[in-house]
A protein has these predicted regions:
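Membrane/wall-proximal cationic-aromatic binding patches
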Residues: 182-202
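Transmembrane and membrane-interface helices of multi-pass
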Residues: 2-188
Length: 202
């Protein structure tokens, strides 16, 4: 009962800024984890966070109540949850072409066996992001909204982070021509793999 009381107390004190940062960090979580465990150049680890953090910040700033935007990103959030589950099977890997093809071509028995092996990661990842949708709902239904001053300030911070990331990428591209955003930065890498998977299916 104490936990429930504390939760109610937190909900009563939380404002849109609190919701905003919780949802931003929830969107960024796969990038942070991949930057730690994924085998990629150091510049790729940095860009994985520096490029996507301001993008997520700006997306959630596009509405006075960030929870509404978060619900609009439902498919992306599902992809995040799937990516975190995948890391428990293939440490340091993003959703790849062969993995996507296996989803459509695997036998029901094989799929059932795989699901039984990753049941706990699915529950953990699904539970975490279910809680973020609760936060998003609280944000969307709240009478309060992000103040214009906060939105302007965070938008400026986001642009500044992008301006820092841009020369890092340009410098890395000159030194390492093989560095591509579609390969180094999640979820761009997954979307590119989805494109490759569709071309192989048809």
């Amino acid at each position: 009962m104490r936990i429930w009381d504390r939760l109610q107390a937190w909900v009563s004190r939380a404002d849109q800024r609190c919701y905003y940062w919780i949802l931003t960090l929830a969107l960024l979580l796969p990038n942070v984890v991949l930057s730690v465990v994924m085998q990629q150049p150091a510049v790729g680890r940095v860009l994985n966070i520096l490029l996507m953090l301001p993008v997520y910040m700006l997306l959630l700033l596009s509405a006075k109540r960030p929870g509404r935007v978060y619900w609009g990103l439902f498919v992306l959030v599902l992809l995040h949850a799937f990516q975190l589950v995948l890391l428990t099977i293939f440490s340091g890997s993003v959703v790849a072409v062969d993995m996507l093809l296996n989803i459509f071509t695997s036998e029901p028995d094989e799929a059932g066996e795989l699901l039984s092996n990753i049941l706990w990661p699915i529950l953990a990842s699904g539970g975490f992001y279910a809680l973020t949708f609760v936060v998003a709902t609280l944000s969307a239904r709240s009478r309060e909204s992000l103040s214009p001053r906060f939105r302007r300030r965070m938008a400026l911070v986001s642009v500044l982070i992008l301006l820092v990331a841009l020369p890092i990428y340009i410098g890395a591209k000159k030194r390492f021509p093989y560095v591509h955003l579609r390969a180094e930065v999640y979820p761009m890498s997954v979307f590119y793999n989805m494109y490759l998977a569709t071309t192989k299916l048809y």
